[in-house]
């Protein structure tokens, strides 16, 4: 098979396709409204946790879930809280076995993140607050932390 310019196509090149993206679970709480919607009595303390989970669905297909949860409080009073699980189904082709886990846990959530970030920003704005713009996430560092924690757990389990 050849491309339009006559050069052969490379059917063995690694490929990543997003088949579908979706909100799997989402909640937004504004427990102190309308009192919390006035001028804040200090700088809000914003707390955000991000986690990634993945599972195989079929050969070469994976469901990846990006979980973002957090909220904001001032002087111990909750302004808002949110919990989002944003998922995607990805097809990976010609990815070497040793690269499969990093691609699934780094590249796939990297592609999901901008959409999940927008959902959170819109919900916070819809709750009466300025939109929360979550900083970009280093999913490679998150993956490395996960691998180190798993290695530590295996080492601890081996000593027991």
UniProtKB/Swiss-Prot annotation:
Signal peptide: none annotated. Pfam families: SecB. The gene is secB. Keywords: Chaperone, Cytoplasm, Protein transport, Translocation, Transport. This is Protein-export protein SecB. GO terms for biological process: protein folding; protein tetramerization; protein transport. One of the proteins required for the normal export of preproteins out of the cell cytoplasm. It is a molecular chaperone that binds to a subset of precursor proteins, maintaining them in a translocation-competent state. It also specifically binds to its receptor SecA. One of its GO terms (molecular function) is unfolded protein binding. Transmembrane segments: none annotated. Homotetramer, a dimer of dimers. One homotetramer interacts with 1 SecA dimer. InterPro entries: SecB, SecB-like_sf. It is found in: Cytoplasm. One of its GO terms (cellular component) is cytoplasm. Belongs to the SecB family. It comes from Azorhizobium caulinodans (strain ATCC 43989 / DSM 5975 / JCM 20966 / LMG 6465 / NBRC 14845 / NCIMB 13405 / ORS 571).
């Amino acid at each position: 098979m050849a491309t339009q310019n006559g050069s052969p196509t490379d059917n063995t090149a690694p490929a990543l396709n997003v088949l579908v993206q979706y909100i799997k679970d989402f909640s937004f709480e504004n427990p102190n409204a309308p009192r919390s919607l006035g001028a804040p009595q200090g700088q809000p303390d914003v707390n955000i946790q991000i986690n990634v989970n993945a599972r195989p669905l079929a050969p070469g297909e994976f469901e990846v879930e990006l979980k973002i949860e957090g909220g904001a409080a001032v002087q111990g009073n909750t302004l808002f809280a949110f919990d989002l699980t944003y998922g995607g189904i990805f097809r990976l082709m010609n990815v070497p076995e040793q690269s499969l886990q990093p691609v699934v846990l780094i590249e796939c959530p990297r592609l999901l993140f901008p959409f999940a970030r927008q959902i959170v920003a819109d919900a916070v704005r819809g709750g009466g607050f300025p939109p929360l713009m979550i900083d970009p996430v280093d999913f490679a560092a998150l993956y490395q932390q996960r691998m180190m924690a798993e290695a530590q757990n295996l080492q601890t389990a081996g000593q027991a």
